Amino acid sequence: MTNSKRPVYVITGFLGSGKTTLLNHLVSHVEMKDTAVIINEFGEVGIDHMLVKSSFEDVVLLKNGCLCCTIRGDLLDTLETLAIREEQGEIPSFSRVVIETTGLADPAPILQTLMIDPIITERYVLNSIVTTIDSVNGLAQL
């Protein structure tokens, strides 16, 4: 790993608002080939990871709860494990991380982890938060 901090991008929004579509569009660009993708799923069986076209060597799927609530520690573990596995040569080098939250997530605890946790802030920096909105039903969901 280099000494520079890796940017983290968080994609969030309600169910059906286009998060996975946006992610698919992003990962189709050659400039994004060295990106680690973390897809958060809620419930027993996740489906978003099956909808994301296989563009990366390493997609980490967190499916045992919502990132914002019950597995915030797992986000920390996942980001740390990605860095360690890269350092050990187990996965390809990556220059950025994209986290797609579940449509049920409140992104606040995720952002808190990314901005405050010393283990994370040593290696990563929150770059941006992208919120998708269903243009037809968005107003009704607010």
Placement of each model-derived feature along the sequence:
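Conserved nucleotide-sensing/catalytic segment adjacent to the nucleotide-binding pocket
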Residues: 54-81
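Alpha-helical scaffold elements adjacent to nucleotide-binding pockets in ATP/GTP-utilizing enzyme cores
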Residues: 22, 74, 78, 109-113
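A conserved segment at the C-terminal end of the G1
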Residues: 9-12, 17-38, 42
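Phosphate/Mg2+-binding loops and adjacent switch elements
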Residues: 85-142
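Residue-level signature of catalytic and energy-coupling elements of molecular machines
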Residues: 15, 41, 75, 100, ...
